[in-house]
Amino acid sequence: RIRADEEKIHRNFLLPLLRSSIVQHDISNMHVGTLIPHFKKGDFDKLYIRFPQKKEIQQAIGDFYLAISKKITLNRKLNETLEGMARALFQSWFVDFDPVKAKLAAVRHGRDPERACMAALSGKLRILPGKPKPDTLDVQLPTAEALDAAIAALDSLSPAQQNSLAETARHFPENFAESELGLIPEGWSSVALYDTAEFVNGAAFKSADFTDDEGALPIIKIAELKQGLSDQTKFTKNEVKERHRINDGDLLYSWSGSPGTSLEVFKWFGGEGWLNQHIFKINTTTQEQSVLVWLILKHLKPELIRIAENKQTTGLGHVTVADMKRLCVAWPDGAALEAFGRIAIPIYEQHSSHILEINSLAELRDTLLPKLLSGELSVGEASAIAEATADKPETMEAATLS
């Protein structure tokens, strides 16, 4: 833990000062550690830092840095909420199959299946969670009394809301069918994870491919997926097959590395680049498909980690194409997928816009900080740039949504 000597430096200024590219570069050049670089308490005696002496300037720079950092934190929290909403929808529709359970219960109890499904979709009908199984399905289905109360509660909704729910409800079947996954909605399919999209592995690069020449594109490895581009990122101008090119909005899956921290699905918003091996680029034909595959990989993460851990050597594990062909998921018919997209795509797009804003704010903060420290830019000028760049309406819209 580091505490500022407030007789010499303002407490809000210490963090941005230590995080500045100048200080970080000086720390890196000290070559502390061998296999695992580290910076000890005693090393601070060798670290010399230049900074403005006036406390009011220090405070202004610190406040500016923290204000942008708080916006970044807010967007991350909003994205946690949005992802939670999307995953809850996925769990209900594609794992527990709540809309189908509601319709089946209504048929058995002589109630209106569509109205029962509407009640489930609106959250007014509570259904026991869990995958449907022949020996437990009856217990999971709502009672006649629960159906009656939930259907009656639909009257509290506006006609527009009821029409929207009815449009969605009509795309769900009234019963289940047996499959290799167990019970899934009638008309749906059991599909191998590998067949839910086109998974294209990245290219293999050698040290001879790297260059700092102008016009070179970054090579995107797992480190870049987690932290963005850095001074450790490698670049190349070599000819690379077009299928390995990635751009903003592409969906990527890291299938090799430390299972607990590396196996993850990512949305890429770091600009144009070349994809490194051990990462899949996920190609889809529709946005509905992209959102569903994103959520499937989120949902299957624990299972994929378990698979990788069983093959773990020297701390690393991986998921193979063969594994993805063995692992199956329930895939909806076209009408249900379209209905899902009408709800999930706006959430997905808002989530993506927050990632873009996070990246933009972080780049702005880290670009302006050295200029503030050197006096090249005043805090007032930096704040004006930040105000002009920040996308406030989207942030407020997301805050309202959450």
Feature annotation, model-predicted:
Residues 46, 50-95, 126-151, 164-203, ...:
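Non-catalytic DNA-recognition/assembly elements of restriction-modification systems
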Residues 1, 174-179, 194-209, 218-251:
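Sequence-specific dsDNA recognition surfaces
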Residues 32-66, 273-279, 311-338:
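A short glycine-rich beta-alpha junction/loop motif
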Residues 29-30, 206-214, 308-310:
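Short coil/turn segments at secondary-structure boundaries
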Residues 86-94, 101, 105-116, 121:
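Internal, well-ordered alpha/beta segment that forms a basic, Gly-enriched binding/recognition surface
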Residues 389:
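Short Gly/Ser/Thr- and charged-rich N-terminal loops/segments
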Residues 1-19, 33-35, 221-222, 240-302, ...:
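A short beta-sheet element
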